[in-house]
Amino acid sequence: MGKVRVRANCRYIVLTTRHHDGFSLYNTCGLNSYDAPHTCGRDIVKEFVDACNKHGIIPLFYHTLLDWHEESYKTDFKEYLKYLRKSIEILCKNYGKIGGFWFDGMWDNPNEDWEEDALYSLIRSYQPDTMIINNTGIQHRGELGHIELDSVTFERGRPQPINLECSPKYIASEMCETFASHWGYAENDFNFKSLGHLINSFAICRRYRSNFLFNVGPKADGSLRTIDKGALEILGQWSKMNDEALHIPEPTDIEIKDKPNNFILRNG
């Protein structure tokens, strides 16, 4: 997969280390046995990080905040948060330098105190330079929920300009988009977006200094379908062809009225 991502011209990759079903792709070090080392005898997260480092790609970790498998999530929320922080501590300590943590699921229990201060402080103590992202979901796109967060998210939605005048630090933004309708691998989901749509979304993201996070779901053996690899490689070819426009200059606020999908760049 690493070679495919290189051809796709990726700057970073986000791996789902644990999703809402509670299964971990990393060694949970005794927290539970519901993880990859206990089922297939492999630490998938370590393999992922090693591959990223080999190919010069920054590894980021998606990690669920909600957990359908862990009983304490429903019965003792404070105890669950201790379990969650121990899980994150394992990822912070055992896999070298991590580019970022991409959290998701707080929207499932919005009225609870998620003790974000404790979680983010833990991460900073082990990984001071890592980015911390917490997906605000479709209903709250572009909102910054905590001062320690480094990016806002636009899940399946067009990014908007961010007012940084009152911010003590630079806040990034990112649009995450699926290729078909599902986030994970779905064998019978053929509702693929066109390459034109994906390229247009990518261009719009860069207009607003936003990153484009393109999701494809690997099969059970870790491989990608031919159509997934093809889409990634075409996006990579297009981004390499337009590298200067996408990654070097800064976008301006000037709009081309008769060509709404075009934008003007300035150097320096």
Indicate residue ranges for each PLM-predicted region.
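Mature catalytic domains of secreted/periplasmic carbohydrate-active enzymes
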Residues: 1-268
